[in-house]
């Protein structure tokens, strides 16, 4: 076992604070509308330029082991805030740095660290309650655009794109961000249910100019099995041909003579057919087939529930207004499913989301809800160079997380104003003893830090502006972008309540642990043994 280096008391805390400051100082230059960029060196390829706090934090490793421990703990604050709300990482880091710095000063002055922590926790609990009271629901498109704009570092086009996407696919819809091909940002919206499976044979194509299959008001056969024998399908094919409508077959697979016969029927124009594989694998495939059945008012033909393909009738088939299939995707538009049944299915999946333990499962379930309830929007980010593309894509993703958080828990005045108002409201809060009161003061002072940092980054005098904002009330604050005072909500400077709340809670949680640290243990660096020198008589 390697030998350890141990530091106690003030020695340990000073080292830890130095690490905290290195990381926080690198992150906090990005805060606010006039925040600067940070350039990150990569082991290969061009450097990355970012204004995203958590991306900067993740890159930082310090040589000194004790300092690095301090830096890593603050990195945890940024990561946790990012996981919870997808944004607010820089705010969380600034809050943590302030609480740790002020807290360690109090510890050095002889206060009891545990009571300080209790005081800080007490203040944060009260502050979160006040934040909830200040929160305003964020429902209209304009407010959503404003939140997106602020989070994308005052880029209005991004805010508008996100608001437009949310309007089209609903609050539940899936919105994804991809790298575009041109210079302009674009928004693609897919109405209806889309899944990643294309036609099984190019002979089904009936729109050669677009290379796709289009079926108008088709019947939809859903089978949870492989179809290789055409005899199983004859009754359904005959019934569909009589009805004079096209048929879409979604099955585990269609192969051999069954596929060949379908192709021949299509080419001769006897019955218009297209076949695709069912989306997903295993149990997820069964669930997705059931989703499509709900959407199109059909039944999944599955031997598990005693249904056989030979006995299927037109009543078992789903229907939709239109189906478009290309080589990679299938889109079912306007299924005839009953709205109440679809909502019931959505509620059932939501319940599974609540119970899901892994992020992957949760994401897949949310996609299913979106496909049933809203639709899918893709924001394609345009830029002139690869470096700009990466930076912009990260900003758009941040803005998307922020707008989601805003829709979830509402918004408060931005620019650090909400925390100043909250601190004003709980200024009279008292702890059980004097040391707890100092802890409360440490937390209250930290709540000014985000506003001060935004102002510093804008090149103004922090104390003057902080006092002016404190003297105002409600959503009165300082707009660092236009350098004027006014009503932040009216000026469209909004922060999602969830982002501000998460930043404060995670910052206080980690900072409280660091203030109560009394000892730090790390491995001693291994001393490299010197090379063996040349022995006597070995001269060339």
Curated annotation (Swiss-Prot):
<feature type="binding site">
    <location>
        <position position="495"/>
    </location>
    <ligand>
        <name>ATP</name>
    </ligand>
</feature>
<dbReference type="Pfam" id="PF00118">
    <property type="entry name" value="Cpn60_TCP1"/>
</dbReference>
<dbReference type="GO" id="GO:0140662">
    <property type="term" value="F:ATP-dependent protein folding chaperone"/>
</dbReference>
<protein>
    <recommendedName>
        <fullName>Chaperonin GroEL</fullName>
        <ecNumber>5.6.1.7</ecNumber>
    </recommendedName>
</protein>
<keyword id="KW-0143">Chaperone</keyword>
<dbReference type="InterPro" id="IPR001844">
    <property type="entry name" value="Cpn60/GroEL"/>
</dbReference>
<feature type="binding site">
    <location>
        <begin position="30"/>
        <end position="33"/>
    </location>
    <ligand>
        <name>ATP</name>
    </ligand>
</feature>
<dbReference type="GO" id="GO:0005737">
    <property type="term" value="C:cytoplasm"/>
</dbReference>
<keyword id="KW-0547">Nucleotide-binding</keyword>
<dbReference type="InterPro" id="IPR018370">
    <property type="entry name" value="Chaperonin_Cpn60_CS"/>
</dbReference>
<comment type="subunit">
    <text>Forms a cylinder of 14 subunits composed of two heptameric rings stacked back-to-back. Interacts with the co-chaperonin GroES.</text>
</comment>
<comment type="function">
    <text>Together with its co-chaperonin GroES, plays an essential role in assisting protein folding. The GroEL-GroES system forms a nano-cage that allows encapsulation of the non-native substrate proteins and provides a physical environment optimized to promote and accelerate protein folding.</text>
</comment>
<dbReference type="GO" id="GO:0005524">
    <property type="term" value="F:ATP binding"/>
</dbReference>
<keyword id="KW-0413">Isomerase</keyword>
<feature type="binding site">
    <location>
        <position position="51"/>
    </location>
    <ligand>
        <name>ATP</name>
    </ligand>
</feature>
<keyword id="KW-0067">ATP-binding</keyword>
<feature type="binding site">
    <location>
        <begin position="87"/>
        <end position="91"/>
    </location>
    <ligand>
        <name>ATP</name>
    </ligand>
</feature>
<dbReference type="InterPro" id="IPR027413">
    <property type="entry name" value="GROEL-like_equatorial_sf"/>
</dbReference>
<dbReference type="GO" id="GO:0042026">
    <property type="term" value="P:protein refolding"/>
</dbReference>
<comment type="similarity">
    <text>Belongs to the chaperonin (HSP60) family.</text>
</comment>
<dbReference type="InterPro" id="IPR002423">
    <property type="entry name" value="Cpn60/GroEL/TCP-1"/>
</dbReference>
<dbReference type="GO" id="GO:0016853">
    <property type="term" value="F:isomerase activity"/>
</dbReference>
<dbReference type="InterPro" id="IPR027409">
    <property type="entry name" value="GroEL-like_apical_dom_sf"/>
</dbReference>
<feature type="binding site">
    <location>
        <position position="415"/>
    </location>
    <ligand>
        <name>ATP</name>
    </ligand>
</feature>
<dbReference type="InterPro" id="IPR027410">
    <property type="entry name" value="TCP-1-like_intermed_sf"/>
</dbReference>
<keyword id="KW-0963">Cytoplasm</keyword>
């Amino acid at each position: 076992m390697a030998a350890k280096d141990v530091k106690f008391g003030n020695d340990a805390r000073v080292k830890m604070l130095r690490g905290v400051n290195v990381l926080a100082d690198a992150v906090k230059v990005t805060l606010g509308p006039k925040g600067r960029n940070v350039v990150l060196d990569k082991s290969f390829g061009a450097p990355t330029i970012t204004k995203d706090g958590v991306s900067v934090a993740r890159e930082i490793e310090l040589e000194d082991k004790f300092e690095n421990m301090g830096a890593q703990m603050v990195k945890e604050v940024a990561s946790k805030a990012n996981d919870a709300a997808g944004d607010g990482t820089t705010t969380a880091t600034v809050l943590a740095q302030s609480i740790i710095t002020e807290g360690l000063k109090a510890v050095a002055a002889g206060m009891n660290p545990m009571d300080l922590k209790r005081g800080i926790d007490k203040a944060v609990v009260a502050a979160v309650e006040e934040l909830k009271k200040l929160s305003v629901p964020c429902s209209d498109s304009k407010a959503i655009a404003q939140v997106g704009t602020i989070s994308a570092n005052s880029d209005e086009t991004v805010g508008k794109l996100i608001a437009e996407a949310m309007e089209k696919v609903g609050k539940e819809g899936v919105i994804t961000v991809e790298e575009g091909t041109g210079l302009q940002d674009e928004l693609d919206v897919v109405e209806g249910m889309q899944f990643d499976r294309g036609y099984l044979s190019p002979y089904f194509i009936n729109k050669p100019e677009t290379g796709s299959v289009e079926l108008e008001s088709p019947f939809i056969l859903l089978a949870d099995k492989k179809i290789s024998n055409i005899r199983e399908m004859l009754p359904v094919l005959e019934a569909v041909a009589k009805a004079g409508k096209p048929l879409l077959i979604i099955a585990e697979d269609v192969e051999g003579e069954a596929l060949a016969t379908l192709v021949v029927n299509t080419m001769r124009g006897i019955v218009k057919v297209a076949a695709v594989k069912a989306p997903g694998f295993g149990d997820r495939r069964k669930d997705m087939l059931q989703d499509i059945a709900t959407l199109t008012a059909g039944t999944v033909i599955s031997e598990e529930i005693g249904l056989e393909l030979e006995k299927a009738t037109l009543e078992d088939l789903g229907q939709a207004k239109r189906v478009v299939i290309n080589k990679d995707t299938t889109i079912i538009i306007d299924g005839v499913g009953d709205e109440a049944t679809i909502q019931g299915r959505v509620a059932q999946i939501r319940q599974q989301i609540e119970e899901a333990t892994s992020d992957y499962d949760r994401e897949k379930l949310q996609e299913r809800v979106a496909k049933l309830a809203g639709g899918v929007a893709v924001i394609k980010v345009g830029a002139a160079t690869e470096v700009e593309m990466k930076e912009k894509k990260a900003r758009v993703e941040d803005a998307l997380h922020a707008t989601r958080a805003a829709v979830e828990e509402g918004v408060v005045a931005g620019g650090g104003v909400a925390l100043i108002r909250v601190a004003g409201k709980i200024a009279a809060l008292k702890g059980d003893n004097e040391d707890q009161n100092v802890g409360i003061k440490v937390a209250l002072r930290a709540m000014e830090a985000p506003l001060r940092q935004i102002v510093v980054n804008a090149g103004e005098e922090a104390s003057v502006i902080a006092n002016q904002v404190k003297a105002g009330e409600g959503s009165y604050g300082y707009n660092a972008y236009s350098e004027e005072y006014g009503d932040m909500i009216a000026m469209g400077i909004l922060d999602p309540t969830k982002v501000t709340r998460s930043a404060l809670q995670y910052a206080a949680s980690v900072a409280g642990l660091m203030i109560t640290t009394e000892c730090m243990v790390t491995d001693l660096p291994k001393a490299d043994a010197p090379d063996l020198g040349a022995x006597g008589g070995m001269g060339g």
